[in-house]
Amino acid sequence: MSAEPHPLYRQLPAIDRLLNEPEMAPLLAEYGPVLLADTLRQLQAEAREYIGQFHTLADWCADWPAALRQRLNQRQPALKPVFNLTGTVLHTNLGRAPLAESAIAAVTDAMRSAVTLEYSLEGAGRGHRDRAVADLLCALTGAEDACIVNNNAAAVFLLLTVMAAGKQVVVSRGELVEIGGAFRIPDVMRQAGCDLVEVGTTNRTHLKDYRQAINENTGLLMKVHTSNYSIEGFTAAVSEQQLAALGQECSIPTATDLGSGSLVDMTRYGLPAEPMPQQLIAAGVDLVTFSGDKLLGGPQAGIILGKKQWIERLQQHPLKRALRADKMTLAALDATLRLYQQPDRLVEQLPSLRLLTRPASEIAACAQRLLAPLIACYGTDFTLDIESCWSQIGSGSLPVDRLPSWALTFTPKDGRGSTLEALTARWRTLTKPVIGRVADGRLWLDLRCLEDEAALLRELAS
């Protein structure tokens, strides 16, 4: 025989009655009846569970409108701003490069109004959506033409599909990389309908290896920049200039996937060198692909530079339409590229470069300012220290190189890992979550990417 329902269940008001109460009118106007009804059902389910466990009504059942408003205020957006104190500047899971203010403004303008996405003001007819950005890229890199898609994986896939479907692609064995999300070059080639031909060895590949692999079915000679790992020691590799010369000699196009790609010499800012697309174009490579949201500091996009005859083939392929960038991406990319026309102001205007070049002394001073107020908040349960550390660029850029930085560390006085886990879990529930990293029994907050100290203190003191 089933148990009798708890008598307190009868004190829970009906949804329709609650929605018709005068106190609900402001909430109905703000959120609408569907969301309110769904949220009230959730609250009632929780109230029944509370009654079943404690045999009494929860305190919030005395004021349903207040409980409803509190629950609605706790709703989380799908994408939530966070403090990135992980020590990884271009963190893939945290959205990679923050956009420049001019790029944010350009995206906002593009969202608010009709724009000349595929409309030519000169001829009052249909234009090409890549044209304006392509012209900027050509001016900055010396390429003949450019093509924009929604990310670099799409750029590589489009390039392989158009240039070498049903043909062989020759690649050094040491460059068959896997990037995030199990994106493997051999798998991409297979999906694009290409036959992979591996040459050389993991650590040494010579020009003769490429030459010996060429036959009547060779469609492409390709290099892939190993942006997320490095092989050192007894190594040899074929330069882009050598490979381009071989391709021209044999009438076979050449391509390089740079992955990250920087339009400026990073050593100019005290950072490690990274291959630049314009260098490869000057070396004679036919097509070069790279990302928009890594070292470039722009939105997620895949950029393909190269010879006009090949870019036109890419633009005309049906797959290009499926992979094309939208107006917001193009607006942000256009605004970001314009910053490169003023290289002397780039550090000032491009957030990613500003964070990468931030002096260690400035970060240390930030740590000193934060230490005392955070000890006041957390000193009972944690020992707080200032420690030197190494930041990384992230997103597969310059994998070996590190940037000197400073961090605040939190060591639990009880020595328990569960205490650290509880702290990090609580910080993830903040209005603006604080994301650090746990290592060596401590929580590390690398301060390289912190630009609003007051906002961080407000969150951590809440």
Curated annotation (Swiss-Prot):
The keyword Cytoplasm applies. Converts seryl-tRNA(Sec) to selenocysteinyl-tRNA(Sec) required for selenoprotein biosynthesis. It is found in: Cytoplasm. It comes from Yersinia pseudotuberculosis serotype O:1b (strain IP 31758). HAMAP family: SelA. Pathway: Aminoacyl-tRNA biosynthesis; selenocysteinyl-tRNA(Sec) biosynthesis; selenocysteinyl-tRNA(Sec) from L-seryl-tRNA(Sec) (bacterial route): step 1/1. Its EC number is 2.9.1.1. GO terms for biological process: conversion of seryl-tRNAsec to selenocys-tRNAsec; selenocysteine incorporation. InterPro entries: PyrdxlP-dep_Trfase (IPR015424), PyrdxlP-dep_Trfase_major (IPR015421), SelA-like (IPR018319), SelA_trans (IPR004534), SelA_trans_N_dom (IPR025862). This is L-seryl-tRNA(Sec) selenium transferase. One of its GO terms (molecular function) is L-seryl-tRNA(Sec) selenium transferase activity.
